[in-house]
């Protein structure tokens, strides 16, 4: 998966808008973060703690949680080595999480 694929998937989610402050893309639903580009091969995706724990167990080569995100509802996806379907599912789950805040 490439960042363009993330843009396509996230952009297809109703109400999600992309901006690129400082040259890195971020996708938000009504101002609430869905995902943010860290570099060309990684995005951080919003995820509740239960979902995060689940994807870390199921897809350890795709998702990780660096120390700086341990206390936050976020998971990092490796676009170059990760499972495309799992990343797409995580983006949709992030959108559902943010929609639930309406």
Where are these regions (language model features)?
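Charge-dense, helix-prone N-terminal extensions
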Residues: 1-102
């Amino acid at each position: 998966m490439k960042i363009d694929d993330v843009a396509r998937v996230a952009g297809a989610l109703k109400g999600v808008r992309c901006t690129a402050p400082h040259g890195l893309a971020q996708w938000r639903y009504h101002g609430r973060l869905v995902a943010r580009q860290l570099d060309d091969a990684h995005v951080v995706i919003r995820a509740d703690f239960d979902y995060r724990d689940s994807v870390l167990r199921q897809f350890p080569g795709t998702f990780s949680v660096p120390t700086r995100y341990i206390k936050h509802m976020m998971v990092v996806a490796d676009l170059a080595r990760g499972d495309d379907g799992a990343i797409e599912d995580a983006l949709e789950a992030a959108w559902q999480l943010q929609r639930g805040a309406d």
